[in-house]
Design a protein with these regions (language model features):
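Short, aromatic/basic amphipathic alpha-helical patches
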Residues: 52-55, 150-160
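A short beta-strand element within the Helicase C-terminal
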Residues: 88-91, 96-113, 118-119, 134-140
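Conserved helicase ATPase core of P-loop NTP-dependent helicases/translocases
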Residues: 38-99, 118-120
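Conserved interdomain hinge at the start of the Helicase C-terminal
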Residues: 6-55
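Short beta-strand/turn micro-motifs composed of small residues
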Residues: 43, 64, 111, 139-143
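Inter-lobe connector of SF1/SF2 helicase motors
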Residues: 1-5
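Conserved segment of the helicase C-terminal RecA-like domain
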Residues: 125-156
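Long, largely alpha-helical accessory region at the distal end of helicase-like NTP-driven motors
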Residues: 164-185
């Protein structure tokens, strides 16, 4: 195996490891349990979206490119239906663009690339402004790794980001926020 092929394989393995890190499942679950609001989660892999949905059963549905059109339609309908118990839709990039649902209050980016456009699109899909609404955009990352570098790169132009390390700190930031939108990292 040439050095270039080995390097490429190592980079893919690093991405997979960071995108699907077990601590991100735990953090997402804790956030969803704590805030108990309609939530969309974004990830980079179908595997993560499906595993997170399993972790959050019966309150979550997946939505991704590997699903049949009817299953996607049902996932959206169940998430939108106020009579449904579904409060979380877990997606792997499929809803990054062109998806609008009123009432989503929290978005959790479990994994992302370094692209600021992706970050902007995900924010727009998840947090629609409405008078009196507080929207919460949370980015999960593994500190001191490439994951953190990707986050910093895609958020270079973000002016209202608050960096915290725990759900407790998110609650404190929310109680002190005078803004109607808080972007928590």
């Amino acid at each position: 195996m040439t050095a270039a092929i080995q390097w490429s394989k190592n980079m893919r393995n690093r991405k997979t490891f960071l995108y699907n890190h077990p601590s991100k499942f735990l953090a997402a679950k804790e956030l969803i349990d704590t805030f108990d609001v309609p939530t969309i989660t974004f990830s980079e892999t179908v595997k993560f979206a499906n595993e997170l949905t399993k972790t959050l059963q019966p309150w979550a549905v997946s939505y991704h490119s590997k699903m049949k059109p009817y299953a996607k339609q049902m996932a959206i309908e169940n998430f939108k239906d106020p009579r449904s118990d579904i409060k979380v839709i877990s997606t792997a990039r499929a809803l990054d663009e062109g998806f609008d649902i009123q009432g989503v209050s929290m978005a959790i980016v479990c994994s992302g690339t370094s692209t600021s456009r992706q970050d902007l699109q995900r924010t727009g899909r998840a947090i629609r402004w409405a008078p009196g609404k507080t929207g919460l955009m949370i980015n999960l990352y593994i500190a001191d790794t490439q994951d953190e570098k990707w986050l910093r790169q895609r958020q270079k132009k973000t002016i209202n980001a608050t960096h915290v390390n725990s759900v407790k700190e998110i609650k404190e930031a929310l109680s002190q926020a005078s803004l109607e939108y808080l972007n928590v990292i």
